[in-house]
């Protein structure tokens, strides 16, 4: 059996970049890392509470954090930033003040920028949220997978693999179902692959969704 490594960590430094860009002393490193995680959780919670979406997709692709001595720059890459801005016109400023209070940024300024992604459904996080929303609404898993693949085809990707594991459709015995369209070369380091694993809580139990998207080869 081939052991499956996380495709993002496998390609770090070649086709994949870091989401946190900062340096620190080894003794302060863990603090910085925890702070990053808290910032990400805080932003996700805020967006979850304040975004009124019909599809249940929050649309956060990734959150990049850059730190300098006097500034923390947070860049939120979103698929549908319009929804957040429409539901809360002053949402970004509110979020900024919330984060500043949370982290007591006395000597550091915190700055938040929201960037829109060109093709939201070419991003595995947004797709996973879409599938999770469908599964919560008791749509059959095959239908949800097919729909997700249709959406990625519009975002002209070269291949996609979707895997759902757990008590699918509320069956007694948990199983793993997967579907692949196009090429997904996991062993080619040159291949630019985006990956995400997402947990969804349904009334039957927890389902795990994994998505690999093959974007292009360098």
From Swiss-Prot:
GO terms for biological process: translation. Residues 47-118 form the KH type-2 domain. Gene3D superfamilies: 3.30.300.20, Ribosomal protein S3, C-terminal domain. Its main location: plastid. It is found in: Plastid, Chloroplast. It comes from the Eukaryota. The keyword Ribosomal protein applies. GO terms for cellular component: chloroplast; ribonucleoprotein complex; ribosome. Keywords: Chloroplast, Plastid, Ribonucleoprotein, Ribosomal protein, RNA-binding, rRNA-binding. GO terms for molecular function: rRNA binding; structural constituent of ribosome. It holds the Pfam family Ribosomal_S3_C. The keyword RNA-binding applies. Part of the 30S ribosomal subunit. NCBIfam families: rpsC_bact. This is Small ribosomal subunit protein uS3c. It comes from Nicotiana tabacum. The lineage of its organism: Eukaryota, Viridiplantae, Streptophyta, Embryophyta, Tracheophyta. The gene is rps3.
């Amino acid at each position: 059996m081939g052991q499956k490594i996380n495709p993002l960590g496998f390609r770090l430094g070649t086709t994949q970049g870091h989401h946190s860009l900062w340096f620190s002393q080894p003794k302060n490193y863990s603090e910085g890392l925890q702070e990053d995680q808290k910032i990400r959780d805080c932003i996700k919670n805020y967006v979850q509470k304040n975004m009124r979406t019909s599809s249940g997709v929050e649309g956060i692709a990734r959150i990049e954090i850059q730190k300098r001595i006097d500034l923390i720059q947070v860049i939120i890459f979103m698929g549908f930033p319009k929804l957040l801005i429409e539901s809360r016109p002053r949402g970004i400023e509110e979020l900024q003040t919330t984060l500043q209070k949370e982290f007591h940024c006395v000597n550091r300024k915190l700055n938040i920028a929201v960037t829109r992604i060109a093709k939201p459904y070419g991003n595995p996080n947004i797709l996973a949220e879409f599938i999770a929303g469908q599964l919560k609404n008791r749509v059959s898993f095959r239908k949800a997978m097919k729909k997700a693949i249709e959406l990625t085809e519009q975002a002209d990707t070269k291949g996609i693999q979707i895997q759902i594991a757990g008590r699918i459709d509320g069956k007694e015995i948990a199983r793993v179902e997967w579907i692949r369209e196009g090429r997904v070369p996991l062993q080619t380091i040159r291949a630019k692959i985006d990956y995400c694993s997402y947990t969804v809580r349904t009334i039957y139990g927890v389902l795990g969704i994994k998505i690999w998207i093959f974007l292009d080869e360098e």
